[in-house]
Amino acid sequence: MDWENDGYRIKNYRNPDGSLRSRPQNIQYLYKAGVSWGKVGQGASSFRYRSEGFGFNDAAPTLFGEEWKPLIASLNSKIFKELLKIQGETLNVTTGLVENLPLLGYWHDENQKIVEKIVDENICDSQNDWNSFETSWDFKRHPLV
């Protein structure tokens, strides 16, 4: 994405008649960390941490907020997988569908630190696994070498 000069070219991309061709939305969240998922897919949805520095779009919706660790833990739980089915999960998991899920306020109790530690460990394990493949930007060497 060409975001040079605060996205000037994108914000000012025009038709020959002078009307705007693009309308960037929610740019205050652009390149911020969040919880993302694939909008279209078969089987259970997988919610994942998306680090800073990446964009988002309709095909990979993203939730933003300070309390993302309990959120990602909740959304990947068996209970929420069942709630998604009840809500009518099809091939498309839209932001509206996720937004309507009842979120429990348990993350401000004594379990918060435990949940956050498990989330951190899972993210670290996933990153280490991904970085062991040459397609990763952070690839250093294959684990068998």
How should each PLM-predicted stretch be described?
Residues 1-113, 117-121, 128-131, 135-136, ...:
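Polybasic, glycine- and aromatic-enriched phosphate-binding surface used to engage nucleic acids
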